[in-house]
Amino acid sequence: MMKPYPAGSYDIAVIGAGHAGIEAALAAARLGCRTIIFTISLDAIGNMPCNPSIGGTAKGHLVRELDALGGEMAKAADATMLQSRMLNLGKGPAVHSLRLQCDRKRYHMYMKAALENQPNLSVRQAEIVSIDTNGAGEITSVTTAMGGVYSVRAVILATGTFLKGKIFVGEYSEESGPDGMHPAAHLSDSLRALGITLRRFKTGTPARVHGNSVDFTRLEEQHGDEPPVAASFATDPATLQNKLPCYIGYTNENTHEVIRQNIGRSPLYGGAIEGIGPRYCPSIEDKVMRFAEKPRHQFFLEPMGENTREMYLSGLSSSLPEEVQTAFYRTIPGLEQVELMRTAYAIEYDCIDPTNLKNTLEFKAVPHLYGAGQFNGTSGYEEAAVQGFVAGVNAALKLQGKPPFLTDRSTSYIGTLVDDLVTKGCMDPYRMMTSRSEYRLLLRQDNADARLMPQGYALGLISEERWQQFLTQQQQKEQEKKRLEKYSIAPTPALNAYLESVGSTPLTQPVRAAELLRRPQVSYAALAPFDPDRPAIHPHAAEQAEIELKYEGYLKKQEAQVREMRRLEEMPIPEDFDYAAQRGLRLEAIEKLQRIRPASIGQASRISGVSPADISVLVILLRQQ
């Protein structure tokens, strides 16, 4: 034990500088709190230890929402992008999701600079070994492995996969963080001393291979969308450029046979790994064993950066022995001569049950202690980043004596994620999906600014310039919707030829432009030649106007559902409500309600094991008080 010494005084300490820690530290500092962020390695700030991309299905929604609130991730992705693709364009706008392939090293450098240049924020390379409290259970300081004692009033835990991290490659294992970095070996003991129960989760990553050893002619080339789409509402898409392609390939029966013959050497199947793995991101050995009927599995070969030949095998994560990895990779067309640069591995780490948190991500049992990211049981950079933002903002607001920052299920995917975590918990690493939201037509990525930028502006995290641009676009959208409702388009041979070409009924008399636009086959852009009086408005405003007119009926139905949900959310439950002393509640409901302690009737109704009858009783009991 090193001799402790006073090292400094801050309002908030953020432990970990991955995607959660970055957003937490930036938000807290921008709100005026003296903040310090600790990382085991400065070279790991904003590291992408798994796929070198930001966004994807549902994750793109989170990135846009974070940007609308004043977060940094979307700007960093735009500044370092190699390729931009909008996913799920064959489906409705509710599930359209942006994914940006990024330059891993440049992303790290962008985020490192963002932290270094942020007023009110100090950046420190050190391992935190304890969180210290006084006799009243109040946080007083954090202590480093070298004895530095930093006086703080609040702590945000954003430890990623570092807490007692342990990697596995076949029979080989060692205590390690991701990418061979030093793990956080001692902090877990300090958390247990605070009464926090920890559990083990695991995740994995594929090998990185040398691009010069790949036969790209045997793989399908995948280019970015033209023109590229920006992740941030503040980025001018005209400044973006697709730089590198990705590639698509497939495993085959030979690949699967090599894996099956060596499955006994897998630490997952051999029982060496105790942690629970991600359900929606299985390893290739998991895919082969669980989906034996499938003759092949798709993977993506993705560049790690502009100035490296290192490439990422998305969809082929593994913890099989190194020589087995080489053998099965080389059965794949295009990878017959492939050379591994980094070995695939699984990593096991400590995390918590997030039902121990409030919806501000503060621990119920330890005031001013917050959790964010994989520490809370989630997977994914984007899920981590939004939790970091929520924790950072709420830690700052609480210290300043201000009301908390809350966003609910009807307002955002961020609210859905937080509510799922603190209400339902997770038995395996939680991943955001559009299917997790009841209101996904309202929670589109294209309207994240309309939903959340007012909150970001009210917090002081959106600049006046961005706010005025937003207001202008919203005004343009509303004016264009009104114009389209009034403007009539007369039938012409050219218009009817277009309508027939897309499988829509030709016109026999004039119709309002909005009615024509409500036809599923007809787009706003395609109507431009038949709408000569159309004003020049921002493309984002035009997109919003089109979607809101085309799906007006569905949107009104979901808005009615939201009003009913809000009625329940606005019925608060006192924090000290004694469920066990109430008559009429079932024992299972009492146990669940006592443990999770929901903040409202709405949250209580979403707890597994609490029935509609229990909710009815609870409403009556609360009204009697």
Language model segments and positions:
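Short hydrophobic core segments
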Residues: 15, 149-160
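Conserved beta-strand-loop-beta-strand element in the redox core of flavoprotein oxidoreductases
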Residues: 132-148
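A glycine-rich dinucleotide-binding beta-alpha-beta segment and adjacent secondary-structure elements
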Residues: 312-378, 406-419, 538-592, 597
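Extended, charge-enriched "interface" segments that sit outside catalytic cores
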Residues: 436, 442-444, 453-458, 462-614, ...
